[in-house]
Structures are given as structure tokens and as C-alpha cells.
Amino acid sequence: MLVHLNNGGCSIVFNFVGDTIEIAHWGAPLSKVTNESVAITKRPIAHGDLDVNPRNLILREHSRGWRGHPALRGHRRGKSVSNHFSIVKHEATKDSFAVQFADQLAGLELNIDYQLDQHGILTVQSTIKNVAEGDYQLEQLLNWLPLPPQADEVLDFFGHHCKERQPQRYPITNGLTTREGFEGRSGHDFTITQIALNKSTNFHSGEAWSFAVAWSGNNINHIEKLVDDNLSIGGGE
């Protein structure tokens, strides 16, 4: 099953994979999406690799073979450190998609809402709920989106009082590219947004994919490139 949101010159495609969901595309508008067009984007399994090759799963769970940074990090006194959520229900319109997941073993419920507006801006909001007895220690809950292979540079911002928002641009390399803020607010060194772009992109033309954490407290922004060249961008508090 596919869910395709198309608005404001932007598309995002969700693909149901068993009891979970992956994001098959986020970026330029698509006129038509089929199961066949999504299937051809699947990466081959290399010799000596895992028998499953998870793509851009929304929750990026290690229990499903994901080897990068997860969406959720937390535990119950050292237990339930690796989650395995399943779809409970979902609802889609032409420009919105809401899905509820549950991990019965961990005692967690997770709701994620996607809204794609008329300007092509995608808003993502995640809410996690502890539905079991005892405390759950939440460490991180990040939202992630896939990037295409032509995204090979990062543009973000740094600064200090009287000279904030200075741009810096550099190549995407293997591993995590991270910008974090620990001031309890969006201070002078806050990057505002982290942008993945092609090295040929300039102020007049080219492709760019921007992710902003709309939060005035501590914040984290990631771009991750795995050894199989899987690229993604994400962030949270």
C-alpha cells in the first residue's frame, strides 16, 4: 500500500512494508507513483550483508536490521532498549498522513503526523506515550526523512552575539554530521535549519532539502550517511 502526499511543488511517498512504514520519496513532485516504481528503488543485498535490507523506515529500528541512528532511544531501567513497533491505525488525506504505532512488549504508543502545505513545507509531529506500569526513560525522539544520492553537501549556520547566522558549507561524509544546541533556548549559535544540497546548488538554482527543528529549547540536527550510501536528515529535541 502506498500513500502519496503532493502539494506545493513537493511530494512525499509512504510505503507500507508488513507492519511498518518506510518513506520511499521526499522531494520533487511526482505525477504518478506505483508499487513497481517504488520497488525499483530497492537496494540490492550485497554479499555478506544482512538478509534483509531495510530502507528508510520511519522508526529506523535496530530490531528490523537498521544499522544507523534510530528514531527513538530510551529504556526501562536498562530494558526495552530496542523497540519493535507495529502499525495500529492510520489515516490519510490528499495532504496529510497520521499513523499510530504500538510496541506491546515495551509498553509504548507512538503517534506521528505529517502535513504537507500549499508551499511544499512538510510539518512532522511525533508524540510518544507510556502505556505500561513503571517509568520509561526517554533519551531521544527524532524525526527523519530520506535524502537522494545527489545531496552531497551540508549548509548550516553558526555564530555569536553581533555575528550570528554565519553560513558554512562542507561535504557530506560517512557517519553522522551533527549540530546540537545545549543553551536551553535557540541561542546565537543555533543553526536554525540544516540543509542538504548538491554541490552545484547556489542562490539562484539547484536542489536543496532543509530540516528545521521548530523548538526553542535544546536541539539536535543530524545528517547521516551509511556505508551503503543510504542518506537521511533528521532532528529533534
Protein language model features and the residues they cover:
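Polysaccharide-binding surfaces and accessory modules of carbohydrate-active proteins
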Residues: M1-H4, G8-V13, I21-G234
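Contiguous, structured surface segment used for ligand recognition
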Residues: G18
